[in-house]
């Protein structure tokens, strides 16, 4: 850092952050070199300002992959690209299926696992959307299986709920209106991955239906 004297006599600290990309090691294309240098500069600004650093291809590739995953995640949310598979829960007494657990999977090849989806939802502050979609889409799947006679209709439905999240009043009312037939068969399981939130847990209990 350097200190400069302004025309009014005041002192101001001045520092410079910069990024460097090399020709031809990083690229032979001028626009690509500028993009790489900009990326290096922004990495300095994110970490510790007042330094100059060289372009890191490995870091750039990792950043590009993370950006693409975030794009895919929001596409998945906006288009509701989820499937809820029903895992049967069998009675030890007579071997009959008395319940199903709805297991979330993403419908995009690069984003299928629940842990991936929940991690991105946490980073992008979209846990509420996952909670809402899980409640609605799992119930929709139950209704579809019932209408196509793939289930009897008296089975319970276990749904994984995020501990810190709950549907708002309007969402809860819409849920009950659409799936009133299912209200006495829903079993809410609180996920252990998320921190417990007493307010959210109370809101879940107070939801209509």
Which residues make up each language-model segment?
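Active-site core of bacterial EAL-family cyclic-dinucleotide phosphodiesterase domains
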Residues: 65-122, 160, 189
